[in-house]
Amino acid sequence: MTEKLTEVEARIVGALIEKQLTTPEYYPLTLNSLVAACNQKSNREPVVAYDEETVTKALENLREKNVVYVFYGSTSRVPKYKHILPDVFELEPPETAVLCVLMLRGAQTLGELRERTSRLYEFSGLGEVNETLDNVMRINAPLVVKLERLPGQKEARFAHLLAGEIDVSAYAKENTISNKQADNQRVENLERELENLRTEFNLFRQMFEDFKKQFE
């Protein structure tokens, strides 16, 4: 495959890999199931809301790129979709699992990859995750890149290159916005907790005053 994937196409391929490995009894996926898999709110970053037309158009492109093909079962005329990404890039199971998570959840640290691939492949430790990343970064056309650690980050992150080179400046800006949103959320949570404590304190004080009055 020489052509890069779009963000929609990468989400579709990631969703197909995930469902193949976690719910093989429902794989290949129908169009409806695939749309739902792309749009699910858990294990997705960002959360999207693709319609059938968007997914159908992307599937047509993926078929032209020889990454996805249509499957018709012997008992159903409803078309179902399969991916063949490991065949295209000669990927081993751990490499497929890592790419799946990167396509579904964006840039990840070593620890996040080990945790979030647990249903797809059981890594023995961070060393095996790192070795797997090295494998897909050392090939002639690397599939993964290690991103520079940004201010406020404790660890470097890794991102897939199936959709092309990473815009580092855009990534840094997005990460900064995300960090600010997280900080704002933490402040809001602390303010809410403080207000709850004040309310509880006032309640206990009133209860104590009422208790004292019994002996006056």
Can you say where each PLM-predicted feature lies in the sequence?
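Positively charged, polyanion-binding regions of nucleic-acid-associated proteins
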Residues: 6-25, 89-107, 133, 138-139
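Residues in the recognition helix of alpha-helical DNA-binding motifs
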Residues: 15, 58, 132, 161
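Short acidic, hydrophobic short linear motifs in intrinsically disordered regions
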Residues: 23-49, 107-123
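A short, conserved structural fragment
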Residues: 56-73, 133-150
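Short, amphipathic alpha-helical interaction segments positioned at domain boundaries
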Residues: 74, 82-112, 156-185, 189
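A eukaryotic "domain-to-IDR transition" signal
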Residues: 78-81, 86-87, 110-124, 132, ...
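Helical coiled-coil/dimerization "stalks"
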Residues: 116, 148-162, 202-216
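Amphipathic alpha-helical oligomerization/assembly segments
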Residues: 177-200, 204-215
